[in-house]
Regions:
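Conserved catalytic neighborhood of penicillin-recognizing serine enzymes
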Residues: 197-225, 280-283, 347-353, 357, ...
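Juxtamembrane regions of bacterial inner-membrane/periplasmic proteins
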Residues: 1-404, 429-431, 487, 527, ...
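Short, conserved loop/turn and helix-capping segments at secondary-structure boundaries
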Residues: 309-313, 448-456, 507, 612, ...
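Short, low-complexity, Pro/Ser/Thr/Gly-rich segments in the mature regions of secreted, periplasmic
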Residues: 754-764
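Conserved structural-core and active-site-/substrate-pathway-adjacent residues in large, well-folded domains
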Residues: 72, 172, 215, 249, ...
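Short pre-catalytic segments that frame enzyme active sites
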Residues: 124-157, 268-273, 301-305, 334-335, ...
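A penicillin-recognizing enzyme superfamily signal
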Residues: 381-411, 417-424, 433-434, 438-444, ...
């Protein structure tokens, strides 16, 4: 009898000791957690700040086209009638604009006064108003574009609990933790209820976590579902309940809860959600909008109203029904709220002015190795806010006009899309980037992520490769005056025979390279690529900055049936505009930590991809495209001077392109459908009008000529023969050549020209 009693006693003592030991471990671990677990404060998470590029104040600026006065207003400058006296003042007269510039601590520049002398709206001199001496390298300070938060690329507006409307607090507590004020961090009733429901439903359909547990998980632990993590989460909740008041915990929860995405940036907190989804403050939200935000907590991405409006409405209605059941909503208010459709009207703030650009910047910073993004990081970008605004407006207006003119574009399930890229060809700076029609509907960046066939945009590079071959004396060489045969031809390919056709279904006989490119004839381009070989053309494209894979068949190379991004092809044309120097596009200039110390400085990645002479001749050919060719209507916007460009239309009319440039700026435009259905429009019809509208806004009316490099000669030729013209030739044109490749034979068709031949033979001028 004593042995069993003794055994039970020992077992009980052992179990009690084990429980006590486990209790001590738990207490010790809890004490350990208490030393470092802390709720965030509103000032503990300084945002990441993204700034535009600086704006150089220099002679020849036009007040209208540079939008200088608008820039001053956006930066908070005040126009005064008296002489400027304080930083932020500016005075404008017919003769001068005097600005008292704000200090720029990041550039170690103090407040500075500067006078821009004017002549009919054009800046003639940049001077010091104190002594009249010329000033150089004077910049307007960068504009703050966006404030996001570091490591998770978060947007969060911290709002004290006292400023959060009771309706929001009550709604969140009703749907997430009805017993918040009565439990101690863990709610046994909720856990038991969840276990029973999950058991009866045969799966996990409901959780039992309290708001305190959710906060602990979000702040301190990974989202992995393991027993160990659940134990730590529960213990952390207990510690938080001991260390902080219920009000502290609730305030942190409402400001830290994850509520969805705005592109690559995470939305945290009810205040930011109200701002991003509805463009409102918390005080302005309706009951159904409050229910929508509260419903997001369960599945921010599954119930996002911007992407999944129907599931979002269903979840919202669940919340509304719960509010009615608990008496927080009357029957009448519930019926009115549930009948409201889902309306999402995000704020039109600086982030939505350039959202695709912001995404591209964050991606480039992370590619540079600044990972994770530190809190308080400052990113100095290359964006020009006024050009960005113009690009956005031109794309929106242009696509709307296309739909009005061509009703078949509106019959599709998806809207026609477009993208715009604006680069500085000399520095590679991305001045503007619009990746789609509506960022709120689709965050897919068509300017950098989409790969589409460029069509005729590849033709200039076929001819550029041939010009370079001529310069180097290699096989396949051609000049701008070379005759190319535009007649029916059949080629053998891996898939059988192939006979290229021109857009107009006609053949035009022998044509010069210039005429073939101006009119975008297909057959001459294919013949030139066949003669030269595709390998040099592919290599040239890669040197110019095209990183996408390019097929080595004739169709891929000559007619652009390989896929590239708008950014790549725009950069390739930028290299031509820059005298053959390819500069990798960059959206970021530098990054600094919260102390102002530089973390990373962008170093331009540049190389001489082609000769300055080859680039100049090709630019001359592309000027002809705008003067006489497929883009001749571009002159309607009144541009005078040197502008070059090329239209692009893909097989089946799925994509429409135009890339045009001056020596200072290159603009690329793409129009098409995301699902690659036929657009049934050419580049001249769909993309060129958008380019024209944007160019008319940002390019001055008078454009300086492209600088002719040494090694270029001009000759008068007969375009019918491509030979030197004689006095008997009925048509004579001036053509440019790389020195050493110019024709030496006089026209053999029209005769005459004895005097010209004698001068050429004996070297007379």
């Amino acid at each position: 009898m004593n042995r069993p009693v003794r055994w039970v006693t020992y077992a009980s003592l052992g179990l009690a000791g084990l429980v006590a030991a486990l209790g001590l471990v738990v207490v010790a671990y809890g004490a350990y957690l208490a030393t470092f677990l802390a709720l965030p404060k509103s000032d503990e998470h300084p945002p990441l700040h993204l700034y535009s590029g600086p704006f150089l104040l220099q002679p020849d600026l036009l007040l209208v086209h540079s939008h200088l006065l608008e820039r001053l207003q956006r930066l908070g400058y005040r126009r005064v009638t008296l002489p400027v006296q304080a930083p932020g003042d500016y005075q404008l007269t017919d003769e001068a604009l005097t600005v008292y510039l704000h200090p720029q601590p990041e550039g170690h520049v103090g407040a500075t006064m500067v006078t821009l002398r004017l002549n009919q709206g054009r800046v003639t001199d940049v001077l010091s108003p104190l002594d009249g001496t010329p000033l150089f390298h004077i910049f307007l300070e960068p504009e703050l574009l966006s404030g996001v938060r570091g490591e998770s690329r978060q947007m969060r507006e911290w709002i004290p609990l006292a400023q959060i409307p009771p309706q929001i607090v009550e709604t969140v507590l009703t749907i997430e933790d009805r017993r918040f004020y009565s439990h101690f961090g863990i709610d046994p009733v909720a856990v038991g209820r969840a276990l029973w429901i999950n058991f009866t439903k045969g799966g996990v359909v409901q959780g039992g976590s309290t708001i305190t547990q959710q906060l602990a998980k979000n702040l301190f632990y990974s989202p992995r579902r393991t027993m160990g993590r659940k134990f730590k989460e529960a213990l952390a909740a207990l510690v938080l309940e001991v260390k902080y008041t219920k009000q502290d915990i609730l305030e942190s929860y409402l400001n830290e809860i994850y509520l969805g995405q705005a592109g690559f940036v995470s939305i945290f907190g009810v205040g930011e959600a109200a701002h991003r989804y509805f463009g409102k403050t918390l005080q302005e939200l309706t009951v159904e909008e409050v229910a929508m935000i509260a419903g997001l907590i369960k599945g921010p991405n599954s119930y996002a109203p911007t992407k999944h409006p129907e599931p979002a409405k269903q979840r919202r209605d669940v919340v509304l029904r719960r509010l009615r059941e608990t008496g927080l909503l009357t029957e009448e208010a519930w019926k009115r709220a549930k009948d409201e459709p889902v309306r999402v009207t995000p704020s039109e703030d600086v982030l939505t002015d350039a959202p695709y650009f912001v995404d591209a910047v964050l991606h480039q910073v992370e590619e540079a190795g600044v990972v994770p993004l530190p809190e308080g990081l400052r990113i100095d970008s290359t964006l020009d806010p006024m050009i960005q605004q113009a690009a956005t407006e031109s794309l929106e207006k242009g696509l709307a006009k296309l739909e009005a003119l061509h009703p078949h574009l509106t019959s599709a399930l998806e809207s026609v899309q477009g993208a715009v890229v604006v680069l500085d060809p000399q520095s590679g700076s991305v001045l503007a980037l619009v990746g789609g029609r509506d960022y709120r509907r689709s965050q897919f960046n068509r300017a950098v992520q989409a790969r589409r066939q460029p069509g005729s945009l590849f033709k200039p590079f076929v001819y550029l490769a041939a010009l370079e071959a001529a310069r180097e004396g290699q096989a396949g060489q051609l000049t701008a005056a070379s005759l190319l045969v535009d007649e029916p031809v059949t080629f053998e390919s891996e898939t059988g025979t192939w006979s290229p056709q021109n857009y107009d279904k006609q053949f035009h006989g022998p044509v010069t390279m210039r005429n073939a490119l101006e009119q975008s004839f297909n057959v001459p381009a294919v013949r030139a690529a066949k003669t030269l070989g595709t390998k040099p053309i592919v290599q040239l494209l890669h040197r110019l900055g095209v990183t996408s894979a390019i097929g080595d068949d004739l169709s891929s190379v000559a007619l652009g049936s390989s896929s590239v991004s708008l950014m790549e092809i725009t950069a390739a044309y930028g290299a031509v505009a820059n005298g053959g120097v390819a500069v990798k596009p960059a959206a970021v200039r530098s990054t600094r930590d919260r102390r102002g110390d530089i973390i990373w400085n962008a170093v331009p990645d540049r190389q001489q991809a082609v000769s300055p002479q080859g680039a100049y001749v090709l630019t001359s050919l592309l000027e002809g495209v705008i003067q006489r060719g497929t883009a001749s209507k571009a002159r309607a916007i009144g541009l005078q001077g040197s502008v070059a460009g090329k239209t692009g239309t893909t097989d089946g009319y799925r994509d429409a392109w135009f890339v045009g440039y001056t020596s200072d700026v290159v603009i690329g435009v793409w129009v098409g459908f995301d699902d690659e259905r036929a657009l049934r429009l050419t580049g001249s019809q769909a993309a060129l009008p958008i380019w024209m509208d944007l160019a008319g806004r940002i390019i001055p009316p008078t454009v300086p000529a492209f600088v002719m490099p040494p090694g270029i000669v001009a000759r008068t030729i007969d375009p019918k023969t491509g030979q030197l013209a004689t006095s008997q030739c009925p048509e004579q044109v001036s053509e440019v050549f790389i020195e050493g490749t110019e024709p030496s034979v006089y026209c053999e068709v029209h005769g005459g020209g004895i005097w010209e031949r004698l001068k050429h033979t004996f070297g007379f001028p």
